From Swiss-Prot:
Keyword field: Nucleus, Phosphoprotein, Transcription, Transcription regulation, Translation regulation
Renumbered residue ranges of the record's region Disordered: 1-45
Superkingdom to which the source organism belongs: Eukaryota
Name recorded for this polypeptide: Enhancer of translation termination 1
Main localisation: nucleus
Gene this protein is translated from: ETT1
Length: 412
């Protein structure tokens, strides 16, 4: 049987992720004009003390974290409340005692999140946007470092510092670089390593930990694709295998992003290891468990891409590919199979009964697996059969949503 075409899953993996910019509304309050906390409804834990200032602050952060994050209203409320507590703490020793590591961390998080809105402020000049983004990041880092000076063993504060660094690299630095940029003072590798040094799996908040790892995932994707041009439409409109090819552009060694590109493999390995640790520390009944497993599956499929290309270039050579020796192809096949099987393990864990899209991702991985197995072998036929069965069930459950994907596969 010939190599089967790839549909939804493959196209999804090859689409470049984009850093989301959120537009700032013209009537949004500024930091100085933020309304007082009493004007904001805050959901607290059942056992929280209504008079506990810190509990209310945590409630505000949770409100923002679990929202659509489409405006800065709550963030400004957090900053306003933190400023108020700092002023009161100068005269009230009891309040000063409540300003623990959580206080400093939430304050720093709010400041760092405001950079997203500053970067997307269309009413400001480009110069002002850059200045505001830099200023808020500096304030956020100053705040978390001040907190660490009082609570040096705080795992939460160290994690917040890592988050700010991972967020700052693309938003403040990479976004302002072009292909010919040269800046010897901008050490992006050093910053990334500094962030990784402070990162750890925070068992008290696996959801927050997951988001930070996703930031690193997005950052590595931005680094990998920096300088490339592509015209892939948003969303998946068809299952045509003929997709736009990315144009590789080699950066000069003096370019600030170049060293990051050279360390991609090691950083992806770090990312996979930490996602794996996070999965081990997350209960299977927790909502984000499937998301963590899904991300791991995608990362292992990504790891399998290069050896897959080497093997398939010989297995299904059309005469136009660079010649690959049998030994190289065999080694590549074994490596690609290893990573693809690992990806399948995670994607199976990520499969949700009420989400046929997750079934299709598993089916696509089985197609990848079949393409890597010896041609017309019993194992290959079994992999393709499994993929067909899963696609059929997903298509039926979704009332024909994946008919094109299924047809494309069967015609291969």
């Amino acid at each position: 049987m010939a190599k089967r075409p790839l549909g939804l899953g493959k196209q999804s993996r090859e689409k470049k992720r984009k850093v989301e910019s959120v537009e700032k509304k013209s009537d949004e309050p500024s930091r100085e004009s933020t309304p007082v906390r009493s004007q904001m409804s805050v959901e607290l834990d059942d056992d929280a003390d209504l008079d506990d200032e810190l509990a209310q602050l945590k409630g505000l952060w949770s409100k923002y974290f679990h929202s659509d994050r489409d405006d800065e209203y709550v963030l400004n409320g957090i900053v306003h409340e933190c400023d108020r507590l700092l002023r009161l703490s100068e005269e009230d020793k009891e309040i000063k005692k409540t300003l623990n590591d959580i206080f400093h961390g939430i304050y720093a998080l709010a400041l760092s999140e405001l950079t997203i809105f500053k970067a997307g402020d269309e009413e400001a000049t480009e110069e002002k946007r850059k200045k505001d983004v830099s200023s808020f990041f500096e304030s956020a880092i100053e705040r978390v470092e001040l907190g660490l000076s009082h609570f040096p063993e705080s795992q939460f504060l160290k994690l917040v510092l890592a988050k700010i660094i991972f967020q700052r690299i693309p938003l403040e630095y990479i976004s302002n670089l072009h292909l010919k940029s040269k800046d010897k003072k901008l050490d992006l590798v050093g910053q990334l390593e500094h962030g990784k040094k402070h990162f750890s799996i925070y068992e008290n908040d696996t959801e927050f930990t997951f988001e930070i790892l996703q930031m690193v995932n997005d950052l590595l994707d931005i680094v990998e694709n920096f300088g490339r041009e592509q015209s892939i439409q948003e969303g998946i409109d068809s299952d045509n295998e003929e997709e736009e090819e990315l144009i590789d552009i080699e950066l000069e060694p003096e370019h600030p992003v170049y060293p990051l590109q050279q360390s991609l493999e090691a950083n992806y390995e770090w990312l996979r290891n930490h996602f794996d640790k996070l999965l081990d520390n997350t209960n299977t009944d927790v909502k984000i468990y499937a998301s963590i497993a899904n991300t791991l599956g995608e990362l292992y499929l990504k790891k399998a891409e290069e050896p897959s290309k080497v093997f398939l270039s010989l297995q299904y050579d059309d005469g136009g590919s660079e010649k690959v020796s049998d030994k190289e192809a065999k080694n590549a096949q074994e490596t690609a199979l290893k990573h693809t099987k690992k990806a399948l393990e995670y994607l199976e864990k990520a499969k949700l009964e009420d989400d046929p899209d997750t079934w299709v991702q598993v089916a696509e991985a089985y197609i990848d697996l079949g393409n890597l197995l010896d041609n017309e072998s019993a194992e290959q036929e079994e992999a393709y059969k499994t993929a067909e069965e899963i696609l059929g069930k997903a298509n039926k459950a979704s009332h024909g949503k994946f008919q094109d994907v299924l047809d494309n596969f069967l015609q291969g």
